[in-house]
Design a protein with these regions (language model features):
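Acidic, contiguous segments within the catalytic cores of piggyBac-derived transposases
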Residues: 13
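Short N-terminal edge-element motif at the start of the domain
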Residues: 286-364
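Bacterial signal peptide processing site
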Residues: 30-32
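N-terminal secretory signal peptides that target proteins for export/translocation
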Residues: 1-10
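Domain-length functional cores that host ligand/cofactor binding and catalytic or interaction surfaces
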Residues: 34-243, 345-347, 358-528
Length: 528
């Protein structure tokens, strides 16, 4: 299968191709797709192949590649996440395969749009010039630049799919590399040092369980309670919540959200938005809205609190269940002592609600935005599977909640400084055990916004930039602990990460977005 020659050596003498060739030459040549060469394709196809190559080259040169999904090797207009990759080995009829391809294309469309928006002005202008020089038959004539780029991407995909064997190739190539560096593990003698890390993890797990076992009234407190409540309506209709969730679970589209009313999804997020009770002892305990400062680094504005949200999915018990992910951001984790390896700029708490078929909570879990400190809080609907006889990390179950109704909210008790989760309490009110004559509580509200907004943040100069680099990390949030944990294979342990890049086990391999994660550790509890 021939690739597209470098445009510096051959190109039709047309206005469109000249503009496209200029864009490619500036950024460098790119490998072409599977579907043929400029000499044996219609001009519109050739122009689109070159446009996509030019855009990819400009994105790479500018360092604005979105790292939340993986490219499907050999198919430049498809991307894949762990959920969609989990279907690749399963039988698919033509309709199912078409839906799956459409979902892969949707991931690329989303990421490509972010990358195009985040290009530096000069690079973006080169692509815009090339787009506007496209002939009408390239697709989406008269539409905006994004729409014309997408039309070309669809045309390139059609060429790739027409190649014999493309279906089998796509299914074998639709994989997501894990976020563990095997070379680092080899250099760090992980087969030996892993036992030391495992011993440390067991100590952490024991201490964490002991902390959760403390009576509420005895929880350590360094400051005053800051109760942070969602600004959205607080009395969701359980029947409506159940209907919305059931509609999502019952859909077999890739992804199911494609058939969901966005307003209904917003209602789900509003219904399950938690209340936070934060032990506030310093400015570091004041959450807020993430923005890019004048120095280009991530900062938090405490004047207005925005919790970022994401709709995710897990495959459990024969169903695809919706997951509501909320992230609360703090300006920093201050050092508890000189040289604290866990301290650093930007901090947070990620809270995930997995809904059952009827829309009621099935299990909660939480991580730090770096992927560390993964904890599970199942409801009584689930029972933990017996732990495997291995040194690898299992599910750290810190608390079990009673059965909860659809729309039930919870209150999260958050520690000062570390911002660790200390307790999960059904309801929205600060419990009596945490109150008293010497206890004051400030009450404020927060709004929610999709976490995709963090991939396109105003940069202060009229453009936008992703909070996350092409490696999926937030620059400037590195922690000294990375020099301790590098032999585990996790790159820059402690640094904040983009969704899809959260490795959550130092010993073993585990990712927060694994589609069978809940099934790996839990089974349905026996009914009484």
């Amino acid at each position: 299968m021939a690739g597209v020659p470098c445009l510096g050596r051959t190109h039709p003498a047309t206005l469109a191709t000249t503009a496209l060739a200029t864009a490619v030459l500036v950024a460098g040549c790119a490998i072409g797709p599977l579907g043929g060469t400029p000499s044996d394709l219609p001009l519109a196809d050739t122009n689109c192949i070159r446009l996509i190559a030019a855009l990819d080259a400009q994105v790479a040169a500018a360092g604005v590649r979105d790292a939340g999904t993986a490219r499907v090797e050999g198919f430049r207009t498809l991307r894949v996440d762990r959920l969609l990759a989990s279907y690749a080995a399963e039988p698919m009829d033509a309709a199912r395969f078409g839906d799956w391809i459409a979902a892969l294309r949707a991931l690329d469309r989303n990421a490509r749009g972010i990358e195009f928006a985040n290009l530096p002005p000069a690079a973006r202008e080169r692509i815009v010039t090339a787009v506007r020089a496209l002939p009408a038959d390239a697709g989406a004539a008269g539409a905006g630049d994004d729409a014309r780029i997408d039309a070309c991407a669809e045309r390139v995909l059609a060429l790739d799919l027409a190649v014999p064997g493309a279906r089998a190739w796509i299914k074998s190539a639709a994989t997501v590399p894990d976020d563990y560096n095997d070379w680092a593990r080899a250099a760090g003698l992980y087969p030996l040092t892993g036992f030391g890390y495992a011993a440390g993890i067991r100590v952490y797990e024991r201490r964490t369980r002991e902390a959760y076992a403390q009576p509420l009234a005895e929880l350590p407190r360094a400051g005053a309670w800051h109760v942070l409540r969602p600004a959205m309506p607080s009395s969701p209709d359980p029947t409506a919540i159940g209907r919305i969730a059931a509609a999502l679970v019952g859909s077999d589209a890739f992804p199911p959200a494609a058939r969901a009313d966005p307003a209904d999804v917003e209602r789900l997020f509003a219904a399950y938005a938690p209340t936070f009770a934060i032990d506030a002892a310093s400015p570091a305990d004041r959450p807020g809205r993430v923005f890019l400062g004048a120095d280009g680094r991530a900062s938090v504005d405490g004047a207005a609190v925005s919790v970022t949200t994401r709709l995710a999915w897990t495959r459990y018990d024969g169903a695809l269940l919706p997951q509501l992910v909320y992230t609360l951001w703090f300006p920093e984790r201050p050092p508890e002592f000189p040289g604290d390896p866990l301290a650093g700029r930007l901090d947070g708490l990620v809270w995930r609600v997995t809904l059952d078929r009827d829309g009621a909570p099935l299990v909660f879990d939480t991580i730090h935005p770096c992927g560390c400190f993964h904890q599970f809080i199942p409801t009584a609907r689930l029972a933990a599977k017996p732990a495997e006889p291995t040194v690898e990390e299992g599910a750290l179950v810190v608390q079990t909640l009673p059965p909860l109704d659809p729309g039930a909210r919870v209150l999260l008790v958050v520690a000062s400084g570390t911002h660790f989760l200390r307790r999960v309490i059904p309801g929205r009110m600060l419990p009596a055990e945490l109150q008293g004559p010497d206890v004051t509580a400030a009450v404020s509200t927060y709004t929610i916004m999709p976490d995709d907004a963090l991939r396109r943040v105003p940069d202060g100069s009229g453009g936008t930039r992703s909070l996350f680099g092409p490696d999926g990390l937030v620059a400037g949030t590195e922690r000294p602990e990375r020099s301790i944990f590098w032999p585990t294979g996790i790159v820059s342990a402690g640094a904040m990460r983009q969704w899809g890049r959260h490795a959550t086990a130092f010993v073993g391999r585990r990712h927060f977005d694994e589609p069978f994660l809940i099934e790996r550790y839990f089974t349905r509890a026996a009914r009484p």
